[in-house]
């Protein structure tokens, strides 16, 4: 299994709409670890670690997000893989 790390900045209406909660739920379904946190600028930062195939599924999901959000864009960068035990909302 090819594990990778990925940092995503999600823009749009993504705060105060349950975005981090639904991201945690979706990540756990895909066995992806990491965190989601609100940024002061109104975006959400999502850091993910896991199998490349599962990260790809999460990236596809993040492009749309939950029904309560309106994603206008994502910026993706690969980061070094780190072993973590869960996905949390900060």
Swiss-Prot record:
Name the UniProt key words of this record, in alphabetical order.
Hydrolase
**Does the entry annotate any disulfide bonds, and if so which pairs?**
none
* Location of the active site: 20, 38
* Pfam families assigned to the protein according to its UniProt record, in alphabetical order: Acylphosphatase
Q: Which class of enzymes does this protein belong to? A: hydrolase
Annotated Acylphosphatase-like domain residues: 5-90
> Which Enzyme Commission number(s) are on file for it?
3.6.1.7
Q: Which reaction does it catalyse?
A: an acyl phosphate + H2O = a carboxylate + phosphate + H(+)
What is a GO molecular function of this protein? acylphosphatase activity
Tell me the protein family, please.
Belongs to the acylphosphatase family.
Protein name, entry field? Acylphosphatase
Q: Which organism is it from?
A: Psychromonas ingrahamii (strain DSM 17664 / CCUG 51855 / 37)
């Amino acid at each position: 299994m090819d594990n990778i790390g990925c940092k995503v900045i999600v823009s749009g209406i993504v705060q105060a709409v349950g975005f981090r909660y639904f991201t945690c739920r979706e990540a756990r379904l895909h066995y992806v670890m990491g965190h989601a946190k609100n940024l002061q600028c109104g975006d959400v930062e999502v850091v993910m670690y896991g199998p490349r195939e599962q990260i790809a599924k999460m990236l596809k999901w993040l492009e749309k997000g939950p029904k309560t959000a309106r994603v206008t864009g994502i910026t993706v960068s690969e980061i070094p893989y780190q072993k973590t035990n869960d996905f949390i909302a900060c």
